[in-house]
């Protein structure tokens, strides 16, 4: 699984009538979920923010979760050897069952609860992202950016950081501020 490409669909983007056509198959020339599945490059499928899709659409996934087959009015996609991951923002198993409903809930093989990242994990993430972003800088930019100062600033505020996206955005912003500040001071 690790190192493989990921087929990802952001279900929060599909909350209207157009999603029905996309999910159940519209005209043959229209974009649809089944065709996207056929063209995927990975057997790891991420249905991100599964909880955001309207409950009326859950039935489209019953056969996929039960038998590994996704079928719309135009295509039949065999996915038996795939790993399907659905994410949501629910806080408990009871909340998942209540909001999604039992028919879809009991089709999930396993539920993994997300816990806040430990301080050690956050520091490892900080270091990985800082090193990656620093290596992307040009030699002249590296002379301007005090990367160790940024690293120390983040270490001191590590418990205020929430997730990888948050850390990445802050690091990019801090590097950007240093570059802009230096450019303005040179003028």
Regions found by a protein language model. Give the residues of each.
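Short glycine-rich substrate-engagement loop in P-loop NTPases that contacts/grips substrate
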Residues: 11-41
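Eukaryote-biased detector of low-complexity, proline/serine/threonine-rich segments
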Residues: 41-42, 167
């Amino acid at each position: 699984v690790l190192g493989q490409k990921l087929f990802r669909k952001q279900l929060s983007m599909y909350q209207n009538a157009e999603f029905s056509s996309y999910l159940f198959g519209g005209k043959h020339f229209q974009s649809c979920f089944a065709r996207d599945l056929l063209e995927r490059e990975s057997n790891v499928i991420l249905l991100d923010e599964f909880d955001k899709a309207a409950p009326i659409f859950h039935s489209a996934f019953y056969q996929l979760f039960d038998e590994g087959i996704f079928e719309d009015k135009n295509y039949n996609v065999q996915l038996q050897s795939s790993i399907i991951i659905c994410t949501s923002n629910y806080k408990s198993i009871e909340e998942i069952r209540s909001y999604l409903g039992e028919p879809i809930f009991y089709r999930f093989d396993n539920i993994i609860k997300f816990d806040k990242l430990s301080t050690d994990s956050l520091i490892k993430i900080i270091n990985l992202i800082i090193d990656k972003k620093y290596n992307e800088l040009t030699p002249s930019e590296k002379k301007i950016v005090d990367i160790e100062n940024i690293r120390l600033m983040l270490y001191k505020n590590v418990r205020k950081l929430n997730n990888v996206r948050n850390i990445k955005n802050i690091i990019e912003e801090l590097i950007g501020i240093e570059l802009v500040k230096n450019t303005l001071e040179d003028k």
